[in-house]
Amino acid sequence: MPRIRELGIYDSALPPGPRNAISDVAGVTVGHFTLIAGTSDTGPAWRPGSGPFRTGVTLVIPHGGNLYQDKVVAAIHTINGFGKPHGFEQVRELGLLETPIALTGTLNVPRVADALITLAIEHNPHIGVGFASSGWGGYSSVNPLVGETSDGYLSDLQGRPIGLSEVRAALAAASAEVAEGAVGAGTGTSCYGWKGGIGTASRVLPGGEELTPRRLRPFAPLGKLSAPGGYTVGALVQTNMGRAEELTICGVPIGRYLRTPEEDSRGQVTGASEERSDPGTSNLEPGPSPQGSSIMIVLATDAPLDSRGLGRLAARAAFGLARTGTPGHGGSGDFVIAFSTAATGATIHEQPLMDAFALAVVESVEEAIYNSLLMAHTVVGRQGHTRHALPADEVARLVRGHRTF
């Protein structure tokens, strides 16, 4: 299964990092736990809560130290708020992240949050009882951060199988090598009618100057973009959004031509050479929500930005999402978490520099979404529900053909 760049149809104004992953931001690691359990042939006697499960958890870990003691600056942005995340409000208020970022299926959220609390207490036993040993007389709590999308089309939501042992396993598996596709929190997700999942990408801002107004260089035209800093921006997505006919790749309306096997079985014209008679409709069974069911976007950077600056970057993620086709449906929970690994933070006031960071966010989010689709394999879930892998060769043919036309 190729990533989008391996197909030879995607290019960008800014270069990717060496892994083209969120872990190109130094110190950032990602861990997955993937649960595929139970037969998909559940039959009419199926009882919710008993499986099968096509779900998991993904952890994004900003650094390898004690995150509760050495918090990182963070920000939250809501594109559309139809979701059930945990811990977002305190990050909005204080601009700090003190646990790994966990992504999972919707009804797993409370159990995953509880697991993060347990792990935080194990490493910080003063949580909840004060800092008597250090002479500080107050009490402390912990704010576990958990994002979610609904994987209920393929997985049994009521079973809620992801808890402490699964989160421990994801933490133990954390690495700078980021697996993509139907893994971790992306095991049971759907994207534009195809199999979605986890995707990642990064961008590097060329140059070596400090982040100060006196050292900014003028910008060249797009395509020869240069910017100060040499900073990295990375994105990781959990994709579970969009209608089949909306899918757009490299500016080409792929969803107007490429039909899912489910659509073909329901009587629509087969093949990718003929446009849908009505691009605004689809016979594809949409799963739990006719609009798709959300995307979680995690952004990381090593640039010394404060929470306000990170919030400005997080807001730009919506443009990368829009490049892939979705207008942002009312029933979709679309959230962005951004953090910086730098020790100090500053707000971006200089417009040329903000433009460079914004482009890095837009491109990395767009490419991460493509990778989540192309790296995912076909998954059969509960009651025979199936999400098929997006056919990479057909996508490449359509993009090249559209450009030739």
Q: Which residues make up each language-model segment?
A:
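Alpha/propeptide regions of enzymes that mature by internal proteolysis
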Residues: M1-R215, F219-G267, G271, E275, ...
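ABC-family P-loop ATPase nucleotide-binding domains
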Residues: P286
